[in-house]
């Protein structure tokens, strides 16, 4: 009878020791990256929804003006540079 009680006690302690382990949830870098990318993508979509034809036209004109000014400065730089003699 005592042997049976000791076996049950050992089994109970063993079960208690195994159930006391709490698994730790480790952070997953890939999941964090995907969550951030999804948030950025959703923010980008919201910004696209806010654009209308006038805003797009204004952005296009601003971009075109910037490119033209850059090309003009580049052209002036080339015209001012002395030609290399061969």
Swiss-Prot record:
It is found in: Secreted. Residues 1-19 form the signal peptide. Hemolymph (at protein level). It comes from Drosophila melanogaster. Induction: By bacterial infection (at protein level). This is Neuropeptide-like 2. Keywords: Neuropeptide, Secreted, Signal. It comes from the Eukaryota. GO terms for biological process: humoral immune response; neuropeptide signaling pathway. Its main location: secreted. GO terms for molecular function: neuropeptide hormone activity. Residues 20-34, 45-86 form a propeptide. The gene is Nplp2. One of its GO terms (cellular component) is extracellular region.
């Amino acid at each position: 009878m005592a042997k049976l009680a000791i076996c049950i006690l050992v089994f109970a302690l063993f079960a208690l020791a195994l159930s006391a382990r709490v698994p730790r949830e480790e952070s997953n870098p890939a999941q964090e990256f995907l969550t951030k990318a999804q948030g950025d993508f959703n923010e980008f979509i919201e910004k696209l929804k806010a654009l209308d034809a006038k805003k797009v036209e204004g952005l296009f004109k601003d971009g075109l003006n910037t490119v033209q000014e850059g090309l003009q400065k580049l052209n002036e730089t080339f015209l001012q540079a002395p030609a290399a003699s061969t």
